């Protein structure tokens, strides 16, 4: 608790510094800087006071949750309490990151340079953490959940208030569409990378042979470590340099967690289904969805390449996460995420997935991250009898959040086990997990595995008029719009101007932190 009280006063001081930068005098900056620095809707002091209110609310919420720690025993309630304390701790730290984006060299290595966008992302992540804390009490004692919900309500209210005080980023110039024939080449390699991926890291991502690694993991004892978890623990804390862990071919049965203090780790395997990290935690076996992940990463700037992450619990065990990602500015390249329900938990922050294989049944790409998926293989599997598949369940719960999923240039199809059951198992593009769920499919190939109505309700009319679901220029037998849902929140994007709002350059301000040209990372659309 002393830690949180100290954090309250320090964050208040940090906010005073950052807001002075946001609202700095116009003559001190170029016209480009001015767009970035004038990021607040309210006077600086009001913003600082609101930030302190958030930290105070978090401190009180932790005190309430912690009261149940020793009384809960070993149960889902106990797991939920542990989750809550960790999540609220992360929420408080996310508020302190604001200073790093503008003053600290460490922060510059892991931010976009757009103070307003960074603020909105990190405040939204704090809101997601509060919400996930409460979600963890699903299926537990109703009295405890009610008490915790009461303690968290002030956190949610104050974080939402803080979010309204930050300007939305201005629209960026529309990228020039790339011709379709160029797009074909884009699927063959990955030669252009985000600007924050350093030249040395680009070489590591491009080469098939890892000759230099800070740590080598090998199950057969030929490396520095035999487990991935030990290699992660040995990595330096808050590193501003890339720390490379080579995980050799093999099957690693362990639950790996890269905590928030482990920055800039790059984990390289020997290929999809050659290096496999596997586990079987599930909701049915007493784990919260958040804690069920086989692999979880919260440290900034994480990069993964050529690895399979899987959860083998099976469809009968319900929520069973293969990978949970809270890394900000993270990259997953040529990785596989295999599971059934809730395979990929893109929980919060900003991430890019390229040339990945993602398989599952119910809500198998879900969470409240701002994430772009390009050139991926997204495959629905056979689940329980009479069960409906839903590919996405995006978790945006406030209209001011910048979060959402864009799936672009990808192949949406059935996995081999579902091909024989297409007539009995319906697969949908997504359903609204939270009130302002936002997902757009653009320029993908959709097989006949996709049900003609396209999208699925969560619970009756819930969120149908507040969600934002969109489709633009998809192809294939599953892409026909003739029988799509008629919900108020569903949109057929008829023009490139509409679709451009969900491209890399607009959704995640990629013209600032991603390269705006290059045949393998496309900032805009394909003509």
Swiss-Prot record:
Pfam families per UniProt: Pectinesterase, PMEI
What is the tissue localization of expression for this protein? Expressed in siliques.
| Gene Ontology, cellular component aspect | extracellular region
Question: Which superkingdom is the protein from?
Answer: Eukaryota
| Cell compartments where the protein resides | Secreted, Cell wall
Q: Which residues form the active site?
A: 342, 363
- The intrachain disulfides are 356-376
The UniProt site entry described as Transition state stabilizer is assigned to 341
Q: What is its EC number?
A: 3.1.1.11
Q: Which family does it belong to?
A: In the N-terminal section; belongs to the PMEI family.
What is the official name of this protein in its record? Probable pectinesterase/pectinesterase inhibitor 32
Organism placement in taxonomy: Eukaryota, Viridiplantae, Streptophyta, Embryophyta, Tracheophyta
Gene giving rise to this polypeptide: PME32
